[in-house]
């Protein structure tokens, strides 16, 4: 048992049973250890560190209720600051940090192993800290927590509550474990992973973005609806609501029965997936004076690339001659494809617009 009575004391620990007692206000004190060590409750130590920062022996360090700087070594450290607002520093190795105070800060240099921050509360990684994984300590917990990455690429994992996850600059992988999660995208390489049935989830983006296959996200939207920067948004096989901004957006629902909103600007709505009853999209704000519908001739067979010819379009419930291919029902808003006009093929609906738009072939472009 080592006791200081004031002054800037240094304690050397080489036995797991060693105990350091330091009263509050007793100087700036440090503990240097060559083995796993946890500070005693009530001992106001300012620095807990390994004796050899370049050593590769795995050493685990725990603080106490006071604020400490805790420094590992080049091995795989487990560092837990406990209650205080701690600064935790790794010197290489695959380190794990436990965060339980909003003021905790993790410092990790580039190339310092594969490092993980595990938190029991909302947490934002410090700029310049190259941590590879940021995760909530209890994935099945339902407490709402917000997680922010930094300029590096991270995997960020939420819990079963309503999380707000923002990867920031790097190409991040963001994972929700249930709850109504919100994901913020600012890198085209960001990936959102959401299992089916995991709540009502939103992806808000400042860049053009395509949802990953298999990610059951309900809403994909431009983060700033009034912005005029052109952003392209693409859904996946699930049904989504997709909302653009005031710029010229290219919006593609992918498969699934999607609800598409351009939100102003000269928008293009893309249809390039197999037609069917489960793949009928609704366009909520189509403006024939500025928006276009882009149809893929690999799906809409027989149409020539470029502007749709007037002969291939008909406004009516059914084709009226053999050249009609794209049909707009002015009464219901249904938009359909008929592969042979008045021949024997049945028309297939692929979208629903507002009724009464008085559309013409000029609203369509074949790609």
Residue ranges and their predicted role:
Residues 1-43, 67-129, 144, 153-215, ...:
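Acidic, glycine-rich calcium-binding repeat modules characteristic of RTX/beta-roll
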Residues 55-57, 141-143, 228-229:
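Short glycine-/Asp-/Thr-/Trp-enriched loop segments that recur within the blades
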